[in-house]
Amino acid sequence: YFITDIELYKGFESTSDYEKLMKQVLEEYGIDTHVTVSMKGSIAGDMSQYDKSEVSGKMLKMLGAKTVTTGQIQDSYVVYAYAKSVKDSVSIGKNKINVNITMNYDETRGVTDIQLSTPIYNEDF
C-alpha cells in the first residue's frame, strides 16, 4: 500500500487533480495503481439510524449515485452505491460499486465520523 493523506483547507474541488497526479507519479515508477479518494468529516453526537440514512441519502443525491446496498459492519453504518459520473469501480458479486459511505460513532470525541470514498473505502473501519 501507498497511502497519502492530503488535507484540503479550501474545499474539495481540487480532489480530482490530486487523484490524477498520484496516478501519474505512481505509473512513472511502474507501480500498478488503484487510487481511492476519501473525504472525512464529523457530526456532533451519536447519529440515529434514521439520521445516518438521511445524511447518506443527501450525499448520494449530490453525487447522482444510486444505492446498491446498505448495512451494518461491526459498529459502522455502510452504504455501497454506484454513480455513472465516477470513472473507477469495483465489482462486489454482480454489482458495480464506486461510491462508499461509512459512518461510525467515536465515543472518545463524542462525534459520528462520516467517510465518503470512491470507488471504495479500503482501510479499517
What is the predicted role of each segment?
Residues 2-4, 35-43, 79, 95-99, ...:
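One face of beta-strands
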Residues 86-125:
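A cross-kingdom marker for long, charged
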Residues 3-9, 40, 82, 104, ...:
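A structural detector for beta-sheet-dominated domains
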Residues 42-95:
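Intrinsically disordered, low-complexity segments enriched in Gly and acidic/Ser/Thr residues
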Residues 30, 70, 81, 107, ...:
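Residue-level signal for the start and early helices of compact helical domains
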Residues 13-34, 56-67, 103, 118-125:
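Soluble, non-membrane globular domain cores that form compact, hydrophobic packing
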Residues 1-49, 53:
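Extracytoplasmic beta-rich ectodomain segments of secreted or membrane-anchored proteins
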